[in-house]
């Protein structure tokens, strides 16, 4: 709920760490289920702080502002309905995952080759000049991180509490800077992470091509028009959920999906007299739901 990328990565790290510790003790754990359980938390990401769809429509100047205005997060991710559903989803995952445990003879433990850890190393010289000492000292990180936090605080003080894409991006940048031990350490972490997401970066041009085809050929319009033809004001949110899950299989990026699907579904909401926030969260729920079978995020 805090950050989809942070949760996805931390979940994988925790699953791996738990499996490694279990391998050192007489305790057998089914590694595929452990990984799947950690990944399943991803199913509620669009309900949280980094929801790209909700943040998109909460950002002044967004693509659809002339039609729906700015939709505050209090109507989307901070609504009582969304918070309740998020907690229910989290509880359901916690209950279901342990029930999927296989028989002891079918347990697959972690591969010993995966236990070898690779951590970014920073080599410090015995004698460093002023610039080198500066880039290996934490003071610059803390200074920059605090400046960003102060800026966010001033923004909240002037405009009240609200979230948009810029605020979320600045928040996580400030946290990354403060938690890193030095500027050079922060850079090394970024470089190391870039190697991890390389397979995702490689896929983006292909999925962008699919997104372009769906947008320019009218395929997205056809799918959405069909949904609208059978939807009512009471069921539009549900059909937005189904269409969001379907389109996500072709456009896995939440922001990219909304750019293609959002305008059409918003027009549907306006024509049926439905609150646009219902469609926004319907598409968001569909996106996060089908991520469980979307291979894009699991390849790394």
Regions from the PLM with identified roles:
Residues 20-23, 185-199, 225-229, 266-271:
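Short amphipathic alpha-helical coupling elements at transmembrane boundaries
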Residues 1-14, 202-217, 228-267, 271-272:
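Hydrophobic alpha-helical transmembrane segments of multi-pass integral membrane proteins
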Residues 78-89, 95-203:
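Hydrophobic transmembrane alpha-helices of multi-pass small-molecule transporters
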Residues 1, 25-48, 74, 234-249, ...:
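Alpha-helical transmembrane segments of multi-pass membrane proteins
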Residues 1-20, 156-177, 295-298:
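Alpha-helical transmembrane segments and their immediate interhelical/interface regions
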Residues 47-48, 204-217, 221, 277-281:
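Hydrophobic alpha-helical transmembrane segments in multi-pass integral membrane proteins
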Residues 193-197, 201, 230, 286-292, ...:
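Loop-to-transmembrane-helix entry motif
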């Amino acid at each position: 709920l805090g950050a989809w990328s942070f949760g996805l990565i931390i979940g994988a790290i925790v699953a791996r760490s738990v499996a490694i510790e279990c391998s050192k003790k007489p305790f057998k754990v089914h590694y595929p289920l452990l990984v799947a359980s950690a990944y399943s938390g991803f199913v509620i990401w669009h309900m949280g702080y980094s929801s790209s769809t909700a943040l998109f429509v909460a950002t002044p100047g967004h693509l659809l502002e002339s039609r729906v205005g700015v939709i505050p997060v209090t109507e989307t991710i901070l609504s009582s309905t969304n918070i309740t559903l998020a907690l229910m989803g989290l509880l359901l995952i916690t209950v279901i995952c342990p029930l999927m445990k296989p028989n002891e003879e079918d347990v697959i433990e972690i591969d010993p080759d995966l236990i070898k850890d690779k951590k970014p190393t920073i080599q410090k010289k015995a004698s460093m000049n002023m610039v080198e000492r500066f880039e290996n000292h934490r003071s610059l990180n803390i200074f920059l991180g605090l400046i960003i936090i102060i800026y966010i605080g001033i923004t909240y003080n002037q405009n009240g509490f609200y979230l948009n894409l810029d605020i979320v991006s600045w928040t996580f940048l400030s946290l990354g800077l403060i938690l890193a031990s030095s500027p050079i350490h922060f850079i090394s972490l970024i470089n190391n992470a870039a190697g991890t997401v390389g397979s995702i970066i490689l896929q983006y041009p292909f999925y962008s091509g699919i997104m372009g085809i769906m947008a320019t050929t009218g395929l997205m319009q056809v799918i959405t028009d069909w949904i609208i033809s059978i939807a009512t004001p009471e069921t539009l949110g549900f059909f937005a959920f189904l269409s969001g899950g379907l389109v996500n299989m072709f456009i896995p990026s939440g922001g990219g999906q909304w750019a293609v699907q959002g305008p059409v579904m918003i027009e549907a909401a306006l024509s049926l007299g439905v609150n646009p926030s219902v469609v926004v969260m319907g598409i968001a729920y569909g996106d996060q739901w089908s991520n469980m079978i979307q291979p894009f995020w699991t390849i790394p």
